[in-house]
Amino acid sequence: MDKTYSPAAIEQDLYQQWEDKGYFKPSGKGDPYSIMIPPPNVTGSLHMGHAFQHTIMDTLTRYQRMDGLNTLWQVGSDHAGIATQMVVERQLAAQGQTRQELGRDAFIDKIWEWKEQSGGTITQQMRRLGDSVDWDRERFTMDEGLSDAVREVFVKLHEDNLIYRGKRLVNWDPALQTAISDLEVENKEQQGYIWYLRYPLADGEKTEDGKDHLVVATTRPETMLGDVCVAVHPDDERFAHLVGKFLELPIVNRRIPIVADHHVDSEFGTGCVKVTPAHDFNDYEIGKRHQTGMISIFDDTAHVMAKAGLYTSTGETLEELNGFNGILPEQYAGKERFEARKQLVAEFDELGLLEKIEKHTNKIPYGDRGGVPIEPHLTDQWYVRVEPMAKQATAAVEDGRIEFVPKQYENMYFSWMRDIQDWCISRQLWWGHRIPAWYDEQGNVYVGRTEEEVREKHNLGDTPLQQDEDVLDTWFSSALWTFSTLGWPKNTEDLKTFHPTDVLVTGFDIIFFWVARMIMMTMHFMKDEEGQPQVPFKKVYVTGLIRDEEGQKMSKSKGNVLDPLDMIDGISADELVAKRTANLMQPKMREKIEKRTRKEFPEGITAHGTDALRFTLTALASTGRDINWDMKRLEGYRNFCNKLWNASRYVLMSTEEHDCGLENDDMTLSLADEWIIARFNSTVKDFRQALDTYRFDQAAAIAYEFTWNQFCDWYLELTKPVLQNGTESQQRGTRHTLVNVLEQLLRLLHPVMPYITETIWQRVKPLVGNTDDTIMLQPFPRVEDNVSHQAMQDMEWLKRVILAIRNIRGEMDLSPNKPLPLLLSNADAMAKGRIQNNESFLSSLAKLESIEFIESDDDAPASMTALVDTLKLHIPMAGLIDKEAELQRLQKSIEKANKEWQRLNGKLSNDNFVSKAPEAVIAKEREKLSEAETTLKQLQEQQDKIKAL
């Protein structure tokens, strides 16, 4: 084996071999086990969140495959409506073209062209991560098969009266001119204002304090053109006498009523709220409660219309509303919403109706793609009536057919499902699944799988029909992911075998948008043999977010994004800066981002390889909590890979070209051999338990502890005295144990660290008589019954003796190479037997020149001592240390440690520092203070021991 472990030299070739040989395919044998990959956006590239989830899924898949299950990890990508359309529109814009000039069909062809060229980025990155997915079954949400499933679902839901078209309030992106989902809305905190406007009371009414007007407080004065009433709280005595009376709406000169509604917060502003149901979600609900009707004043680009749209509170069109014909003041027609705001405020001021303006910090909803404030907008959209489906989907989690890990996320799921609103599924885009609905010239709607089907079903002959221009929300097709990818609506063998799937690995942020909708759709359309609704998956493993080292969310605008491939391959500081500062939305951040990046990564990022990255992600995967990324852990696990590599080289050098007991079973196992076999067995048990309960962090800790501490640090050292001085039978036994434990350890580690384990295994397999092609298809280690528990106890006791001697060496600052005499008193028969039977291990690992039993402590000269149970260890100090010199050395160390303690204590007692420093900095300083206290205490104890000699 090469002297040093070089991931770059092995990873890509190995993956290609695995893929070419079809190892990722279901075996067709054993019980089925399936995981559906959450389909990443076809536009995207893998980020740390993907790397994290994919590591978890691949670990589970490889583990179950090795455990003999018929595993399918289903791969695919999402067409990502808005995101993809924008990418291609930007490319067109760079060539001076728009999609409108190109036309719908040509534009969609362009997107398919782009998808063929660039859609592969993400799949290549998945290969780099070692994802063992079945690439031959790769799906795309716009594939013909999946499109059939989407049309089928739409038609059936429509037939079941669960899909309807209606005019409702939606999040509208005026830049992209489409409805968008709540997930695509980003609330940004901004400095804004509250305007206090006077609305005159009609019919000579007066307020309690004799005023002839009410003052309304608003953050959106421009929407007053569409006001339908003013609301006050029913318990607000100031306005009780005015409920049911009227106001004169300024500028528009309409009479609007004063209503009482519990939604009003009497403490905010003046306690009087203007209500514009067509332009605010809360107002929409108030309008519905009071049947006020709605006045829509903006067009799709958020400009004021000359004539407002008038509607009932349920969305039916009206010619007039309470005598108002919809004509808006002409000075505002065609004005952009924020321009209209300025003009309206100025006009209120001129009319003497502007009471005051106050500064106010506001959360403004922005579209995450269009980058402009979202407008609540009344439009005709298609909706799914989800309440009936939600009941069934809630019950599936309540009765345990679906389990969330960790369980606390079930409450989040329930709170959404019990307050569920109808789902807006139409989008005003061109890229996506076009809605299978057609209109005749009279506006009648016909829903069907194809135009031919619609004509035939409704006897339309050659009546002109126009297909709906809109496409479906991307989440609509991804809600069908678990069954559409397996061939539904056909009843395929795959569907019968792999559905329901076993586990879904996903982020908490899409429990509602994706997980809940998958459960609803699947249970509505998939039935088992008894005709009972089928769930899409039995477990939902919910991951937290991966944040940067300071706990900040990773984002392009903050310039703190880490690319998993940069951890694998490495990147220079200059390249990293260039990457983080390219295409910034706010170019002024460039300098700040560069400064931060160079401070954090002065030398760039070194290559760590895929296995180190995967092991780090696994080790950080504590259930359901956000993870603060830690480069030091990554470096530590890169060292872990080196440790495994070097340990394997030692094993191979000690066993290749030697008899490892394959041909000759005349073997004697040492205590160390029996102990490591038993230790490994308990490691297998604990590791399996951790993976079976989704405690990936524990699994990583168990594997690390055994590999580094027990196998490398202890067992390999314990083999040296046997291999140097043991009998032929003993040497054969130790070599046999070395190769067999290493081979099984590689199998245990393989699901998390596939590359390094496969590479080493190929060298080890002939030594254990294995001729198979790959570690991937080897059985995962099982828990054995026939291990020696006595060997475990004996060896653990001997380790305590060795550690006690090493501690004395450390305390006395003695060279690790200096052989020491050991005197033992108070030894019972068991201790004596353990020492005498294992003198070679003790002498070698504790570096002893002699071992002698004495009758009592009185027979020992001046010594440093330690206790192991009742056994007392004495290391005579004569000739080993100069007492005075050692006391002087310790005194200097104590003074230095005391100085450091005083410095840190002073800093933390300084109120100025504590009040201004970030929490993370204070925590670090407290940690240092605690370490300084421990050091000081240890030095003082050591000084007392030397004085007592």
Curated annotation (Swiss-Prot):
PROSITE patterns: AA_TRNA_LIGASE_I
A GO CC term attached to the entry: cytosol
CDD domains according to UniProt: Anticodon_Ia_Val, ValRS_core
Keyword flag ATP-binding: yes
Keyword ATP-binding recorded: yes
Catalytic activity: tRNA(Val) + L-valine + ATP = L-valyl-tRNA(Val) + AMP + diphosphate
GO molecular function, one term: ATP binding
Motif 'HIGH' region boundaries: 40-50
Subcellular location: Cytoplasm
Coiled-coil stretches: 877-949
EC number from the UniProt entry: 6.1.1.9
Position of sequence motif 'KMSKS' region: 553-557
Subunit description: Monomer.
Function recorded in the entry: Catalyzes the attachment of valine to tRNA(Val). As ValRS can inadvertently accommodate and process structurally similar amino acids such as threonine, to avoid such errors, it has a 'posttransfer' editing activity that hydrolyzes mischarged Thr-tRNA(Val) in a tRNA-dependent manner.
Protein name per Swiss-Prot or TrEMBL: Valine--tRNA ligase
Source species taxonomy: Bacteria, Pseudomonadati, Pseudomonadota, Gammaproteobacteria, Alteromonadales
